Swiss-Prot record:
This is Signal-induced proliferation-associated 1-like protein 3. GO terms for cellular component: apical part of cell; apical plasma membrane; glutamatergic synapse; Golgi apparatus; nucleoplasm; postsynaptic specialization, intracellular component; stress fiber; tricellular tight junction. PANTHER family: RAP GTPASE-ACTIVATING PROTEIN, SIGNAL-INDUCED PROLIFERATION-ASSOCIATED 1-LIKE PROTEIN 3. Residues 41-157, 240-325, 438-461, 1040-1104, 1117-1164, 1184-1632, 1678-1705 are annotated as: Disordered. The gene is Sipa1l3. It holds the Pfam family SPAR_C. It comes from Mus musculus.
């Protein structure tokens, strides 16, 4: 750029004042100088002495403006002819003026010198007031370039060619500026003028010549008290308000401050009215006013954009109401974009006078130089001077003047970047401003930014700064397919409104000059909309209203919403005048004239609207070597080093400039005068040309390297590339008015494979923050990710810089000239008359009163309807005035003071709201919210906002509930990790209160759920005396309300996981997104979990979320079938009773039905791919911690013997059915961790009878503990009520514990997780595959599936998980047959859409599966367990606990002795509970009366004995009972993990016997499937110990081996979980043995004995009846282990069949007979297994006895030896 240097005599005074400091006093321009002579002293060189003759300057070029190329913004400014012409008239100096200017120059120089090193007091007092004016004006271009100023274009200065071209443009603009009036007005003072471009590096910027107090002194003449400390303090106090509220900062106040005063003085008479109105505002009134305005100007360094009112608060307070009162647009007007919502007509009118005064104020690197002499420039100037102390430079003035309270920078530094005044640094961890609740809960803006920024913009969420257009066409709304890229921010995309909706279409343009607003332009268009069913044809008017302000009113208004005397909906339409008068009543309609219909008008309007849009950017790159930091050093690096070359190669392509046809950024593409090559690239349709310092021409004899600086110094954004060892960068070292943003990139390990880069950013303080945010403490590897990140940062940086004062002012002036040109030269004489061509009609219409607009018509507008509200800013703990906008796509909040978006979310993300009389809380996403208060006197706005939300979102009004606990302290529902209700206990207190499956908890006891982890959620529900919750009801189908981005993100991540984790057999690994696949009414519950892909912190939640997807996966089922045997057995019983019930359980009921089922249902669905589940957890990574804990806890329970599960879990990949296994694996792997939460699951299982504690660990476990039964107490109560009877029993209990884990609200992920943990802890897990099979079925089943190593086992396991999942998902009215469960899993996953919820549980336990289970004799116990599971659902916790105990005993313990009478149907929950009470926990934990303690449920009067008999006897009964239980008892009976958990909780890992492990699961399983119980009946307990369990084992044999597989089979689903526990050596309890409750159980011994007998006699029948659904013809005789496996496999293959079986539990006579035969065979096998187990146990007992005897002998021997030693020592002592 070219700089104007004063004539020789201009700097005379400077010599005297600055001579001491000057180092370069050459008469001619110094080779390295590009600044005016007058400023050499400041820049480090000295001006020529006073005595220097004019001859010295004769060699300089003439004062004419040099013809230098215009670049960048300056180039655009130069192209603004209208403004230039107007300004030129005023700026042409006269000779006399020149003379005055010379004199003035001397004074100015001296003043500068004073600023730079002399005391301010030395400044002449006469120049005080003028200096003050200059001060304020320095913020404006006009002031800075006054004629009196040495460098003023109007002065007789010789142009310096050394300046960058950037100044030329600015100089030209300045020349055009009205400098005369200022110069003339203040002839005695040097007129202020500012420099642009690299020249700005000079510290001498306009006013900076004086210190702040100097100015005050000078101003004393006008206001003696201006300098008073009190006044100053007051002014300062006001200023802050003005800064923060009045205007963005520098922009509004400075521009409107002092400059206004001067400008007002120079205003023409035409402006007297405006002047008088704003005198007080401008400080023209009293001296005080002047002071305030001055201070405002001085301190206001913020951009106008920050403040809605450029005048500033101070001015506003004194200004007329119209200036201070914000303009409110009609509510029926739908805004097209964000900036339209900020349109303020009063502000536009108030700023009319100041527009001309708001000259190009400096910002960015030059911000220090102009308005507040940025420290950056000051420091750089001082640096160049060397002798000057930066403290005495204009920087000091800036600090004092601009912000009396600031500006020292932000004290934010690191090894890349130092803090700098007037600059703001971003070194990592910063986040954009957001007023939502979660942002405050997360911590400081920098907190948790890393996670937030890991992929800053690579998500469906939009950053606040990227929100522009609010009215989005349907085809573009929430486009899931759109690529995820970093958001481009700070772009006014709404500027294309005219291009997209008006150009080429019929519309009308009107121009005119309003007396208040000045030139205005209106575009209006009428368009047809879809007809309304009730209101007929619909039309809307699209309107664009432009004023000189950059903010434009764009939007539309429905014809029906417009008051008019004309009929709506006609082809003719309304008079345009009516629409405009309604929308903009303040506009003088009569001044408008129709625009000429010429291409020029359209072209001009497009330029006017889109002047801020640019897709071409030029960016500078400076190379900083080790030990360097200064601008000069960087510019003088002649060649690029290898590290720099490597960086350039990554950043873009090196192109040859000669002949280059794309964007060249002012580089010479013809003669190579600017270098031969440059760096060019593109990103998201943006072209970027880099000005690389080493590629630009190098001048050896010019240290300033002007040929390089002329380009880089004029770039708004500059990248500083630092080699290792470079000194930290500071903008103080850069001298440029245009460089506003510096992006520092430092390379680490350059030119190696480990090369990486770290970043930091510093921006001018009046430039808003921009993204993508830099992760805290993160380095970027050399990759396209880093390249994209950096390019997005560069583009956003330039966009943000354009909002700074300088560019804002330039754009405003340009816009004003465009409008003026249109209003004067492009209009016709046709007015916009309401009558128009219908004069007669209009005359008559005038007499008519305008009809009111149709109420609520605007509610259906696509644009954003806006309301003024007060929003709670949780991050800052304050309330801010905002505009709420709700369009068809977004809900946004705009801060009126800063004029920025402070919140946005998709309408599809809104899930609910809580309205009050004058406030409203809007919930979105996972329960986060914003809190709004209606403006005073606008209470009706809340009603309108609610109505708008109903129209545009899928949310619903929240419901407050106070939940009661039952006798066991249970709440009666399960909660998933994301706060959605997995299941609700039928007829429980929660159910009675209106809680339904799919409901979403957003607040618990006044605590926002979004801030709670799953564990915390459960603990809060467990421990709160009074549980008050705020819930958002689900959709009609029971699906939870979820945010669209959440759903999309989860879906996207889940599929990824699935594909990534796909395991052999076509099943995705646990990570796989199986849950996504599942889709069905029932699965809706799980689906949400799936959506969330929450790591299922509560294993329960995870499985739910993933189960859905898994459910569809058939391969998982297939793998499950083997495991299905046991799982089938375990779920068979429950499902037999609950198949129909489960199916028919509505989505809402499903939750209740599946207290445990939700988890299991999910699991059932998800079980198809336990591995998927594991994979899913990855998508849910954010929740993994919880997932780990809860999952582990539930995993423990569910993986009950998951110690082996770990290994098995790996197997589970083949048998992905076990979602739990993923967690189970975790628990197994972590062991202690799993055990930690298992207790939780136990509680959970207890909580919800329906919860399949093991089968559905995810939901039941945590959920149960949390809500279902307040499982915390439940699980604890389980422990309390039931004490492990035997080690084996405790082992079973551990599985139950897994179910107990259920106590965690949704920890139920792994019902058997606790047991799994115990198992994991126990060495027995050695045979994980066996235990997994068993465990898997019963809630451990999932885990089992996850952990079973053998495919068969996996299949078994997966079925078990299915059972759990099904139970969980569908009120585990699991089919009685355990085999059904595994197939159900498989089937569930296929059928899942519906089954996932209720069928899920059922599907989880398909008839086939159950048959298989029953086929496996060992499963009977599991079936009984399943039966208990059902029981637990319908029965109180106590029942479940008892049942689980019973089942466990039956399965693992007493099974061997006698098949426990199948409580499978458990029609009478009480009976079942009683029977199981002791069995489950080995203690009379649950009493028949305990059921009463449970939440209210349908009561079944049958006694336990009757129930057992029914279960045993009924072929039909199994199914019937399933129905009964399914309706309520079954569901209630269906135990979630909570029941199982209870059992497991009691049992210890040491009880790892398959039976005991099984029992825990079986207890759950009992509720889920009867068949499982028969399997369980077999001594599955220590299968792991002995590799060959009874018949059950054979079926598992494929996976484990005959002995072990059989045991596994025998173990059944619950056994699977137990088996995992057993994976350590576990013993199978004789399924024939029925666990007996303790006397304290409250059971009648006679009833128990009868039940036991019935169980023994009818065990086969029970199994069959329970298995009926599962054993349906699809399941071939499951009697043989292999058959069981096969049937299980079939189950998975025919998921629906499985569910159908469970549904069809009642078979025809032939089918029943067949089932009975199969069951008999299975029973026979079970008996054989039991016998084998007995033999094994006997041998073990013998071995233990031998060991005991040996140990005793050794102990005695040791004692004897010790005695002898003692005697020996005593003797020696005596002798001594």
């Amino acid at each position: 750029m070219t700089t104007y240097r004063p004539l020789p005599n201009d700097g005379v005074d400077l010599a005297a004042s600055c001579g001491a400091r000057s180092t370069d006093i050459l008469p001619g321009p110094h080779p390295g100088d590009y600044t005016p002579m007058g400023f050499w002293a400041q820049n480090g060189s000295m001006p020529q002495p006073l005595g220097e003759s004019p001859a010295a300057t004769t060699t300089r070029p003439s004062p004419t403006t040099p013809a230098m190329p215009k670049m960048g913004v300056r180039a655009r400014v130069a192209d603004w002819p209208p403004k230039r012409d107007a300004l030129r008239e005023q700026s042409n100096p006269s000779p006399s003026q020149d003379t005055d200017g010379v004199k003035t120059t001397k004074v100015a120089h001296s003043m500068r010198n004073l600023q730079n090193g002399q005391l301010p007091s030395s400044t002449p007092a006469s120049s005080g007031s003028r200096a003050f004016h200059r001060l304020s004006r320095r913020r404006s271009k006009d002031v800075e370039f006054q004629d009196g100023w040495p460098r003023s274009p109007g002065r007789a200065f010789l142009p310096l060619r050394h300046r960058s071209s950037s100044e030329i443009t600015l100089s030209e603009c300045d020349v055009e500026e009205p400098g005369d009036p200022r110069g003339t007005r203040h002839p005695g003072v040097l007129p202020l003028f500012r420099e642009y471009g690299s020249t700005s590096s000079i510290d001498v910027q306009g006013v900076p010549e004086q210190s702040f107090f100097d100015i005050l002194n000078e101003f004393r003449s006008e206001q003696p008290e201006a300098r008073g400390s009190q006044n100053l303090r007051e002014l300062l106090q006001v200023d802050p308000g003005a800064l923060s509220g009045g205007s963005c900062g520098t922009k509004g106040d400075p521009r409107n401050g002092q400059p206004t005063k001067d400008s007002l003085q120079s205003l023409q008479p035409l402006k007297e009215k405006e002047k008088s109105r704003k005198k007080p505002v401008r400080g023209l009134g009293s001296g005080d006013t002047v002071d305030s305005s001055i201070f405002r100007k001085l301190r206001s360094s913020k951009p106008e954009g920050e403040v809605g009112r450029p005048l500033g608060e101070t001015e506003e307070s004194r200004s007329p109401p119209e200036a201070s009162r914000p303009w409110v647009c009609q509510k029926s007007f739908a805004h097209f974009d964000v900036q339209s919502m900020l349109f303020d007509l009063n502000e536009a009118a108030a700023n009319r006078v100041s527009v001309a005064q708001r000259r190009n104020t400096t910002t960015g690197a030059s911000a220090a130089s102009a308005a507040s002499a940025m420290v950056t420039l000051t420091a750089s100037r001082a640096h160049s001077l060397g002798t000057l102390d930066p403290a005495f430079t204009s920087t000091e003035d800036l600090n004092c003047k601009e912000n009396l309270e600031q500006d020292l920078g932000d004290d934010n530094s690191n090894d890349l970047l130092l803090s700098c005044p007037h600059f703001r640094n971003e070194i990592g961890g910063e986040r954009e401003r957001n007023v939502s609740f979660s942002r405050a809960s997360v911590g400081s803006p920098g907190g948790s930014s890393e996670a937030h920024m890991a992929e800053p913009t690579l998500s469906t969420h939009r950053t606040n700064a990227s929100i522009s257009v609010l009215e989005v066409p349907k085809e573009q709304q929430r486009t899931q397919s759109r690529p995820r890229q970093y958001s481009i921010e700070h772009v006014d995309l709404g500027a294309r409104y005219y291009q997209d909706y008006f150009v080429g279409k019929e519309h009308a343009n009107y121009f005119g000059v309003d007396e208040k607003l000045g030139p205005v332009a209106v575009s209006i268009k009428r368009e047809k909309l879809e007809d309304h069913k009730d209101h007929g044809p619909q039309y809307q008017y699209r309107i664009i209203f432009r004023t000189r302000e950059l903010i434009t009113l764009r939007g539309s208004i429905l014809e029906d919403a417009t008051p008019t005397a004309t009929k709506h909906g006609t082809g003719r339409g309304l008079p345009l005048k009516d629409a405009l008068e309604y929308v903009i009543p303040e506009l003088n309609i009569h001044c408008l004239r129709l625009a000429l219909n010429t291409p020029k008008v359209t072209e001009q309007l497009l330029k006017l609207d889109e002047q801020g849009l640019c897709r071409k950017h030029k960016v500078g790159i400076l190379y900083c070597k080790a030990g360097q930091s200064s601008e000069e050093e960087m510019y003088n690096n002649e060649e690029a080093g290898p590290a720099f070359e490597e960086f350039l190669d990554l950043l873009g392509d090196k192109v040859c400039l000669k002949g280059f046809t794309k964007y060249a950024a002012q580089l010479d593409v013809k003669t190579d005068s600017t270098g031969t090559h440059s760096l060019y690239t593109t990103y998201q349709d943006y072209e970027i040309m880099f000005h690389v310092s080493t590629l630009l021409p190098y001048t050896p004899n010019n240290r300033q390297q002007l040929l390089r600086k002329r380009h880089i110094g004029n770039d708004i954004v500059t990248i500083i590339f630092q080699e290792p060892g470079a000194l930290p960068f500071t903008p103080k070292n850069i001298r440029s008015h245009f460089q506003h943003v510096f992006i520092i990139v430092r390379v680490h390990n350059p030119c190696t494979e480990n090369v990486c880069y770290s970043m930091a950013v510093t921006r001018s303080k009046d430039a808003p923050p921009f993204g993508p945010p830099i992760p805290n403490g993160t380095t970027f590897r050399k990759s396209d990710v880093f390249r994209d990140f950096l390019l997005a940062k560069v583009i956003n940086a330039e966009n943000a810089a354009h909002k700074s004062d300088k560019f804002h002012t330039m754009a405003t002036r340009t816009r004003q000239e465009y409008l003026k040109d249109l209003a004067e030269n492009c209009v016709s004489n046709t007015p916009i008359d309401s009558s128009g061509k219908f004069n007669l009609i209009s005359l008559t219409s005038k007499k008519k009163e305008k009809t009111k607009a149709r109420a609520g018509a605007e509610q259906h507008s696509a644009g954003a309807i806006a309301w003024r509200v007060a929003a709670q800013d949780y991050a800052q703990g304050s309330e801010i005035d905002c505009i709420l906008g709700i369009s068809n796509e977004f809900v946004v909040l705009l801060d009126l003071r800063t004029k920025e978006v402070v919140f946005n979310c998709y309408c599809g993300d809104v899930i609910g709201w809580t309205p009050d009389s004058s406030t409203i809380k809007i919930f979105y996403g996972r329960g986060d919210h914003i809190f709004l208060q209606a403006a005073e006197g606008s209470v009706e706005d809340i009603r309108d906002i609610v109505q708008r939300l109903k129209v545009m979102t899928n949310g619903w009004e929240t419901v407050d509930m106070t939940l009661r606990r039952n006798g066991l302290g249970q709440l009666g529902f399960h909660v998933k990790y994301d706060g959605t209700v997995a299941e609700v206990e039928d007829y429980g207190f929660a159910w009675q209160a209106g809680l339904r499956q799919g409901s979403r908890l957003v607040e618990i006891c006044k605590v926002a759920v979004v801030t709670l982890s799953h564990d915390q959620m459960i603990d809060l529900l467990r421990t709160s005396v009074t549980v008050k919750v705020v819930i958002i009801p689900p959709f009609e189908d029971g699906t939870p309300r979820r945010g669209w981005p959440e759903t999309y993100d989860m879906n996207a991540s889940e599929p990824k996981t699935e594909s990534e984790t796909t395991t052999p057999g076509g099943r995705p690994p646990y990570r796989s997104n199986a849950p996504w696949q599942w889709s069905g009414p029932a699965s809706h519950n799980s689906l949400p979990a799936t959506k969330w892909t929450t790591p299922a912190t509560p294993g329960h939640a995870q499985s739910l979320s993933r189960l859905p997807k898994q459910t569809p996966v058939v391969p998982f089922r297939e793998s499950q079938p083997l495991h299905s045997k046991r799982p089938v057995s375990f779920p068979e019983t429950p499902f037999a009773a609950s198949p129909a019930g489960a199916d028919r359980v509505p989505p809402y009921r499903q939750p209740s039905g599946s207290f445990s089922t939700p988890g299991s249902a999910t699991y059932a669905r998800y079980k198809p791919s336990p591995e998927r589940y594991a994979a899913a957890p990855h998508p849910l990574l954010s929740f993994d911690p919880h997932f780990m804990h809860d999952g582990m806890s539930s995993g423990d329970s569910s993986s009950g013997g998951l110690t082996s599960q770990e290994s098995t879990m790996e197997r589970p990949k083949p048998e992905p059915l076990w979602h739990v296994p993923a967690q189970a694996r975790l628990s197994a792997m972590t062991g202690s961790i799993g055990s930690k939460h298992p207790s939780r699951q136990d509680a959970a299982g207890k909580d919800s009878p329906n919860r399949h504690s093991k089968g559905e660990p995810q939901y039941s476990s945590h959920s149960s503990s949390n809500t279902l039964s307040s499982n915390a107490s439940s699980s604890h109560s389980d422990d309390r009520w039931f004490d492990p009877l035997d080690p084996l029993e405790p082992e079973q209990d551990p599985f139950s514990k897994g179910g107990s884990s259920d106590s965690g609200i949704d920890t139920t992920l792994y019902t058997s997780s606790p047991s799994c943990m115990s198992l994991a802890k126990a060495p027995r897990p050695t045979k994980p595959h066996k235990p997994p099979g068993n465990i898997g079925l019963c809630g451990g089943g999932r885990e089992s599936a996850g952990r079973p190593h053998p495919v068969d086992r996996r299949r078994e396991v997966s079925p078990a998980p299915v059972v759990a999942g099904q139970n969980k998902g569908y009120r585990p009215k699991l089919y009685s047959s355990g085999s059904c469960t595994p197939p159900g899993l498989v089937g569930g996953s296929r059928d899942p859409p519906r089954q996932p919820s209720d069928m899920g549980s059922r599907a989880g336990y398909p008839t086939q599966v159950y048959k298989t289970a029953s086929a496996e004799t060992p499963r009977p116990s599991q079936l009984s367990q399943c039966s208990p599971f059902q029981l637990s659902t319908s029965v109180p916790k106590s029942f479940f606990s008892k049942q689980p105990a019973h089942n466990k005993h039956s399965t693992g313990w007493k099974r061997t002795d006698e098949p426990p009478p199948r409580p499978l149907p458990f029609t009478d929950s009480k009976k079942q509970v009683d029977t199981n009470a002791k069995n489950v926990f080995g203690q009379p934990r649950l009493r028949a009366s305990l059921r009463d303690l449970r939440s209210p449920r349908k009561n079944y009067k049958s006694t336990i004995e009757d129930d057992l008999k029914k279960l045993i006897v009924m072929d039909n009964l199994g199914p019937e009972q399933e129905r009964d239980t399914g309706q309520s008892p079954q569901k209630s009976l269906q135990r979630t993990l909570s029941d199982e958990s209870l059992c497991s909780g009691r049992r210890e890992p040491s009880f790892a016997s398959p039976a005991s492990l099984e029992p825990g699961l079986p207890s759950d399983v009992l509720f889920t499937s009867t068949c499982t119980f028969p399997s369980s009946t077999l001594p599955a307990r220590r299968q792991h110990q002995h590799a060959h369990p009874p018949s059950g084992a054979p079926s598992t044999t494929p996976a484990t081996g005959n002995g072990f597989p059989e045991k596994k089979s025998a173990i059944s689903a619950s056994e699977l979980s137990l088996a995992d526990g057993r994976d350590r050596p576990l013993r199978r309890l004789d399924p024939g043995m029925m666990p007996l409750p303790d006397t304290a159980a409250g059971l009648e011994w006679s009833s128990l004995v009868n039940a036991a007998k019935a169980y023994e006699v009818q065990r086969a029948v029970s199994l069959f009846s329970l298995n009926d659904p599962a054993l349906s013809p699809e399941i071939p005789p499951a009697h043989s282990p292999v058959h069981s496996h096969l049937s299980l496999e079939r189950g998975p293959q025919t998921p629906r069949a499985t569910p159908t079986m469970s549904e069809e539990s009642p078979l025809d006579l032939t089918g029943k007979v067949y089932q009975l035969e199969v069951m008999l065979k299975q029973l026979h096998t079970d008996l054989q297994k039991e016998k084998q187990d007995k033999v094994v146990l006997q041998s073990e007992v013998a071995s233990l006895r031998q060991n005991n005897q040996r140990l005793q002998e050794e102990s005695q021997a040791a004692s004897e030896q010790l005695r002898k030693f003692a005697e020996l020592f005593s003797r020696e002592k005596k002798e001594l």
